[in-house]
Each structure stands twice: as structure tokens, then as C-alpha cells.
Design a protein with these regions (language model features):
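Active-site acidic-Proline motif in GNAT/NAT acetyltransferases
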Residues: 61-66, 70, 98-100
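Amphipathic alpha-helical recognition patches that constitute DNA-binding helices
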Residues: 58, 103, 110
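Conserved catalytic-core motifs of GNAT/GCN5-like acyltransferases
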Residues: 93-97, 109-131
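Acetyl-CoA-dependent GNAT
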Residues: 7-66, 77-78, 83, 139-140
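Conserved GNAT acetyl-CoA-binding A-motif
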Residues: 84-97, 106
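Residue-level signal for well-ordered, solvent-exposed loop/turn and beta-edge residues enriched
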Residues: 5, 37-38, 114, 129
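Short amphipathic alpha-helix that is part of the acyltransferase structural core
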Residues: 1-7
Length: 140
């Protein structure tokens, strides 16, 4: 969130607002080193909509910069697909994958996600310029 290059939120969470935010999710999972307790990444999973579209879920992922290249993201996304199915969702949809997030886009496509097109200038970067976003989906 602080980098302003991938998440739509602009405000950082403190301990109280963070606890409330994560408690609201259908699933919150972490990639943690069991020996040291160090958290390398996490994801949240929740409904993308309500009612007749409530079978579609959405997720967001974060991987610690120093842990990139260790396949943490792949493990998080794969687990998220399993959790989505286990919670009764039928589709996992990403609403806004930023164009410059090429590592994530390649990972999603390698794991079977389908791009739905492009939304020109759909994401305002921290420095104020706009980048395209790509919605993706995966049938669970």
C-alpha cells in the first residue's frame, strides 16, 4: 500500500483498523517461516459482490519485497484458489491488476487466469500518473 503501485487503498492500517479489516475477510492467509515466525506474504479473500453475483470472489496479495523470487506469490495464489473453492465460490476475479505489475500478470496467466481486457488509465499511481489495469478471472 505504501508504495502506491498495486493496491487501491491510500491509507495505511494501524493495529486496530488492521485487525478489523482482516477479521472482515472470508479468508486471510499468511506465508510464514515456521521456525522464525517471519511473515513473507499474505492474501485476503472475500466476495467480489453480493446477491446474484455473490458466487464470485476477489483476492489481494502482498509479498515482502525481499522474498520476491522465492515463489511465495505462487503458493499464496494456489492456496487462494483452493480456499475459494472450499468457501463455495465459483469464480475468482481480480478487478485491477496494474499493467506494470508484470510478474503478477505472468503468474496469474501461468496459473490459468484469463484476462478480460484492459481499462485504460484505471489506476492512479502514487506519483499521480495513471496506468492501465487488467481484470482477470479463474473458474474455480
Amino acid at each position: 500500500v505504501e508504495d502506491g503501485v498495486a493496491f487501491p487503498q491510500e491509507e495505511l492500517l494501524d493495529a486496530s483498523s488492521g485487525a478489523a479489516f482482516f477479521a472482515e475477510q472470508t479468508c486471510t492467509a499468511v506465508a510464514v517461516d515456521r521456525q522464525t515466525g517471519h511473515i513473507y506474504g499474505l492474501y485476503i479473500l472475500h466476495p467480489n459482490n453480493v446477491g446474484r453475483c455473490g458466487h464470485i470472489c476477489n483476492a489481494s496479495y502482498a509479498v515482502e519485497r525481499e522474498a520476491r523470487g522465492l515463489h511465495i506469490g505462487e503458493k499464496l495464489v494456489s492456496d487462494c484458489l483452493r480456499q475459494g473453492r472450499a468457501h463455495g465460490f465459483r469464480i475468482l476475479q481480480f478487478n485491477a491488476v496494474v499493467a506494470s505489475n508484470t510478474h503478477a500478470r505472468h503468474l496469474y496467466e501461468r496459473l490459468g487466469f484469463q484476462p478480460l481486457g484492459v481499462i485504460p488509465g484505471g489506476f492512479r499511481m502514487k506519483d499521480g500518473h495513471y496506468e492501465d489495469i487488467y481484470p482477470y478471472y479463474h473458474v474455480l
